[in-house]
UniProtKB/Swiss-Prot annotation:
Top-level taxonomy: Bacteria, Thermotogati, Deinococcota, Deinococci, Thermales
Species this protein is from: Thermus thermophilus (strain ATCC BAA-163 / DSM 7039 / HB27)
EC code(s) of this entry: 1.1.1.23
Residues reported in the UniProt entry to bind Zn(2+): 244, 247, 345, 404
One of the Pfam families matching this protein, by short name: Histidinol_dh
InterPro entries in UniProt: Ald_DH/histidinol_DH, Histidinol_DH_CS, Histidinol_DH_monofunct, Hstdl_DH
Protein name (record): Histidinol dehydrogenase
Keyword set includes Zinc: yes
Amino acid sequence: MIYAAEEVRARFARRGLSFDPTVEEIVRGILEAVREEGDEALDRFSRDLDGYPVEEVPKRAWREAYEDLDEDLRDALETARERIEAFYREEARGGFLRAEGGGVLAQLVRPLERVGVYVPGGSAPLLSTLLMTVVPAKVAGVREVIVASPPKVHPGVLAAAWVAGADRLFAMGGAQAIAALAYGTGRVPRVDKIVGPGNRYVVAAKRLVYGTVGIDGLAGPTETMIIADGSASPRLLAADLLAQAEHGPDSEPWLLSPDRALLERVEAELSRQLQDLPRAEVARQALEKGGLVLTKDLEEAFALANLYAPEHLSLALSDPLPWLEKVQNAGGVFLGEGSPEALGDYIAGPSHVMPTSGTARFQGGLAVRDFLKVIPVVGLSEGAARELAKKGALLARAEGLEGHARSLDLRR
C-alpha cells in the first residue's frame, strides 16, 4: 500500500518504546529471586524456562566449534572481525593532559573492567551479534567480556566467541541471565555494563537493572527506512525491504520517495519476490507494519525520516553524499545502492546494534565509547586556585551553600 506523507506523519511523531506491565512484573520476580538466592534461583529458572541448568562453556569447545566450521564461513568471520576492529580502532583514541596556569587540566579515558554481552538464541544463530558487541568492547580495552546465550548454545555462536576474543561464555538466557550478570552469583561474576539485544523479557530486565549496572539501550523490533529517487532499482529496493522484513512480524520496513511510478514498481516487485522467500509469511506481516510513502519531494522525505528516527536509513539516490547533511536522526546511514543495510548487518564495519523505536533522536549505535568512561582531573596551581576562588565563592553563596564558599575563601 502506498501512503501519502500526511497519513504517516502523526504516527511517526508519536513513536517510542512501550513496556508491558505484565512482562515487567514477571521479570521483577525473576530479578529479585536471582539477587537473593544466586545460583540456586538461576538454575531453577534456567531449567524451567530453557530446559537446562546454567553451565559455563569452556574455551576448548569454542575452538573446536571454530575448527569445525566450513572454511569459507571461518574466513567470513575473520574478515568481519578485522573490519569491525579497524572501524573502531580510530574511535578508541582519546583523553588529554593540558598545562593550565602552572597546574594541569586533564581527561582520563578508562575502559570498563567487565562487560556482559547478551546474544539471543532462537531459530537463527546470531554469530554477527556476538562479533558486533564483543569486538568493540575488546578494542576499547575491556579486561573481561562475558557472553550469555541461551542453552544449548549454537556451535556458530561458540565459534564467533573464539574469533571475537570473548573471555567467558555461559549457557544461560532470558531475564535470569540479565539478573546473574547484573547482581553476580557464585558462578557468574557481576559486570559493570550489559549490552546486546533480546526479547521483551530481556529488554524489561535490562531496564529494571539499569542503575545497578549500565546498559547500552533498550532495543525494540528492527526497522529500516529507505529514501529513493527515480534512479533507484525497484528490484534492489524490494530486496532490501524484504531483508529487514524477514527479521520478524514486528519489523518496520519503509520506503519514501517523491516518484510514484517507482513506488508502484517496487510494490509489484515485492509481490514477486515474496513468492519464493522462505520467511514470506513473516515478511508479509512486517510489510503491513511499514509501507511505501509518496512525498512531495526529497526534502519532505528527509523531514519525515528525521521525525521517524529510524534504526537504519538507506539513501538510494543518484548522488547521496550531498544529502547526508540533511540527516539528523538515524542509528546508521547507508549511502547508495552499493551499500545495502544487509552488509551493515554482517561485515561492513560498524556495529549493527543500533537504536530503535525512535530512540535515535537521543542515542547512537553501539561503539567503543559505550565501553569507556571519562574521568576529569583538576590540578590547579596555588596562584590559579587563588584567582578562581573569589568567583567560585560568589557562585556558591548565590546557591546558598556557605560551606562551599568558606572552603574557597580559605584558598584566597
